[in-house]
Amino acid sequence: MARMHARRRGISRSVRPYRTQAPEWSNTDKEAIIKQIVDLRRQGSSTAEIGLVMRDKYGVPSVKLATGKKITQILRDNDLASEIPEDLRNLIEKALGMRKHLAENKRDIHNKRQLMLTESKVRRLVKYYVSSKKLPKDWVYKPETAEILLSK
């Protein structure tokens, strides 16, 4: 399949093996895993970082197989989930960084183009999250107020 904003194909990569239960060698102590996820979140880690730490440091290849819940669901149950989904937050941070760069470098046309592409991805994601009711119906991305949104 092709990339979204390029005229080239995607890259091949490995695929996680299909499993219905956690492997025998993995750490499957449900309460300890949930406690560790909550602790990592309180330290300021994102859900992606939590997943990497759980895999690399604690030997949990899939939190969902070990606990029956995804990381975001565990965080929601403990009132630690963020209001804005992580992928949307990352794209907004990227767009903010580009806007700051363009404020100092007004003639950087390549970065202007990248900003347009990134903000179109943001709008597309917002449309999806509003339709799937993960964001309120009146939620709109505005570059002027984006920094305030991320500080919450």
From Swiss-Prot:
Record keyword Ribonucleoprotein present: yes
Tell me which positions the record assigns to the signal sequence: none
Subunit relationships: Part of the 30S ribosomal subunit.
- The keyword rRNA-binding is assigned to this record: no
What's a GO biological-process term for it? Answer: translation
SUPFAM superfamilies to which the protein is assigned, alphabetical? S15/NS1 RNA-binding domain
HAMAP family recorded for this chain? Ribosomal_uS15_A
Name the family the entry cites. Belongs to the universal ribosomal protein uS15 family.
Disulfide connectivity for this sequence is none
- CDD domains recorded for this chain? Ribosomal_S15p_S13e
Keywords from UniProt, A to Z, are:
Ribonucleoprotein, Ribosomal protein
Show the GO cellular component annotation of the record. cytosolic small ribosomal subunit
A GO molecular function term, named singly, is: structural constituent of ribosome
Q: Can you say what this protein is called?
A: Small ribosomal subunit protein uS15
Classification via Pfam families: Ribosomal_S13_N, Ribosomal_S15
PROSITE patterns linked to this entry: RIBOSOMAL_S15 (PS00362)
Superkingdom of origin organism: Archaea
